[in-house]
Amino acid sequence: MTIPQSPTTEDIVAALRNADAVQYGEFELSHGGTSAYYIDKYLFETDPKCLQIIASAFADRINETTLAGVALGAVPLVAVTSTVAGQPYVVVRKKAKKYGTGNRIEGRLNEDEEVVVLEDIATTGTSAVEAVNALRDVGATVERVFVVVDRQEGAREQLESNNVEMEALVTATDLLVDDENV
């Protein structure tokens, strides 16, 4: 698989499928609901070609902006995107640790700095909103969240209610449009 210069929705869908990241059956999701399909972020985030395509697509959308990734899932995404885009990044922990620096935000971040949050899969948007709020609490300006896959289950609306625009590389509709398994 060649890495396209400016990956399209179709390129990203193909990369996710080639990484076997789309699975079918009955799955429990992190918010407690169930689904007939599952997008295995660990399969696409550990596949070098898929990760490069995703990072290139994110980099095409990023200006002179600091990136943020939510630990643990979005760390590979933000690290590779940072390298492709040539932009710095920070990692947002779910909560501050009681050891080391005790920081919730890891990396360099200045007050009033513009930050774009990268997320793997958006379902309800809760983890993205929590990351946005943690960044805002330390003085960052956060108005955008980029996700690889929007499951179209309320994340966009929850983010909009927090004055954040969400942009997805692909939606569940894009990913499952030709699939008879769902």
From Swiss-Prot:
This protein's UniProt keywords: Glycosyltransferase, Magnesium, Pyrimidine biosynthesis, Transferase
Protein's UniProt keywords contain Glycoprotein: no
Regions crossing the membrane: none
Catalyzed reaction equations: orotidine 5'-phosphate + diphosphate = orotate + 5-phospho-alpha-D-ribose 1-diphosphate
Enzyme nomenclature, EC number: 2.4.2.10
Entry cofactors: Mg(2+)
Disulfide topology: none
Protein name, as recorded: Orotate phosphoribosyltransferase
Organism (species): Haloquadratum walsbyi (strain DSM 16790 / HBSQ001)
